[in-house]
Amino acid sequence: MSQQTAITPTRAQDFPEWYQQVIKAADMAENSEVRGCMVIKPWGYAIWELIQKDLDQRFKDTGHTNAYFPLLIPISYLEKEAEHAEGFATECAVVTHHRLEAQKDEATGKTRMIPTGELTEPFVIRPTSETVIGAAFARWTSSYRDLPLKVNQWCNVMRWEMRPRIFLRTAEFLWQEGHTAHETREEAIEETLTMHKVYEEFQRDVLAIPTIPGEKTEAERFPGAEQTYTVEAMVQDRKAIQAGTSHFLGQNFSKSQNICFAGRDNTQQFAWTSSWGVSTRMIGALIMMHSDDDGLVCPPRVAPQQIVIIPVTPKEESRQAVLDHCEELARTLRAKTFHGQPLRVLVDRRDLGGGAKKWEWVKKGVPVRLEIGPRDLEKGSVCLQRRDRPANEKSFVPETELIDTAADILQSIQDTLLQRAIAFRDSHIRPASTLRELEENFSGEGDADWLQVPWDGSPEEEEELAKRLRISIRCIPLGELGRGEPAPCILTGRMTKRRVLWARSY
């Protein structure tokens, strides 16, 4: 007899539908009436706010400041950077008129709003902001003394998505995009790699997501970039999620946007630029990485509430005493800190049964649940349940011990989620040396491991193979995973030391 779960279907039965049901059960987001656009509900948005807060400090610690740039980009800006524009052309939303005019339909009697006032030059709703920020950089730069420029903006972007999936692929999504301009090529490359490292460390330490850091192949590179670096995450169905990218743009954008300056030798030079970004897609990765068949499992560092206290009041005469004690415990816990921040603690005072409350917080992924009733008051203990363990597993601990160790418990949960994810990832990456191995691994419809293979194919050969097997090269890993003894490329037979990771992806 199968064990009853809070989420139906389970991961094993239908992973894509399980993912949608976890989001629904945790009350994180929903589809809107605008196709491809989502409503991020308070619980999901609270996670995004915590992500923003941590990342924003990391950006400032690395010398960046926040700014804001226009949502609308003149088409002429995109025409200046043909390769970049072509990469986004099929995803662009275009604004062609500047007002609406009411017209009454004589046949139906209904009033329709008709676009009128055609624009002389259409605008694109930003898919990314390299061009418009580049134009600003050109205005701000005249001398090498004006460099480096290092700005970030938190905003929304628009890319028409044919197959939307909440958090993972939506037409409109929230993100941050960093843009920098430098005096030398070396400085710009250093910036690109620094921010790539920031993303890797953030994903690991805050989201408990272990990523594979690497460089994209030419075929997978950001349009207009000389180099693109990525952090790739493996989720529970073994598909890859690109969790963040950092791009070295060379002088491509500075030449098209005329970002030039008088150098130290008084000659006119073009700046070297970079850009980098992560989005609400990270929330999708978090869900798919950690959650189980009972709902969301949220790492403590981004949990909107880290501890929920559930008063158990079977008798009215003990109700007020239990509630008062729960509030006092919450105040005591909020005075404690976890990674420099006060603990986020909620007392659930709603007039609901204990079971209903418990399962709601299980499905929302709260790291620690505490139940306190009249007997617990007498004993000076609490009933503790951890979200990284089975939902019905509980332990009774002295309240004084809980207060002293609350931050340690949260760190233990954070560490457990990370180590569990590392073990899963490492058990599903394996080497392969022939094309046949690749074809066999990805031939079925079920879950497939990531394969580390020798590769020296051209962008055209890569694209053909990727299309045929419905897979992609996720990256050329940095470090040992991306290098090996000389071996024949699985497609061309040419000897190469380079190793790449092939996988299915979202």
UniProtKB/Swiss-Prot annotation:
Keyword Transmembrane annotated: no
Query: Could you tell me which SMART domains the record lists for this protein?
Result: ProRS-C_1 (SM00946)
The record's GO CC annotations read:
aminoacyl-tRNA synthetase multienzyme complex; cytoplasm
Kindly state which reaction or reactions the protein catalyses. Answer: tRNA(Pro) + L-proline + ATP = L-prolyl-tRNA(Pro) + AMP + diphosphate
Q: Where does it localize?
A: Cytoplasm
Q: Which UniProt keywords apply?
A: Aminoacyl-tRNA synthetase, ATP-binding, Cytoplasm, Ligase, Nucleotide-binding, Protein biosynthesis
Q: Which SUPFAM superfamilies does this UniProt record tie to the protein?
A: C-terminal domain of ProRS, Class II aaRS ABD-related, Class II aaRS and biotin synthetases
Coiled-coil portions: none
Q: Which GO terms describe its molecular function?
A: ATP binding; proline-tRNA ligase activity
Which example biological process does GO assign this protein? prolyl-tRNA aminoacylation
Keyword Ligase listed: yes
EC number, as in UniProt: 6.1.1.15
Domain of life where this protein originates: Bacteria
Family statement drawn from the similarity comment of this UniProt entry: Belongs to the class-II aminoacyl-tRNA synthetase family. ProS type 3 subfamily.
Tell me how this protein assembles.
Homodimer.
Q: What is known of its domains?
A: Consists of three domains: the N-terminal catalytic domain, the anticodon-binding domain and the C-terminal extension.
Cited function: Catalyzes the attachment of proline to tRNA(Pro) in a two-step reaction: proline is first activated by ATP to form Pro-AMP and then transferred to the acceptor end of tRNA(Pro).
Q: What is this protein called?
A: Proline--tRNA ligase
Gene name of the record:
proS
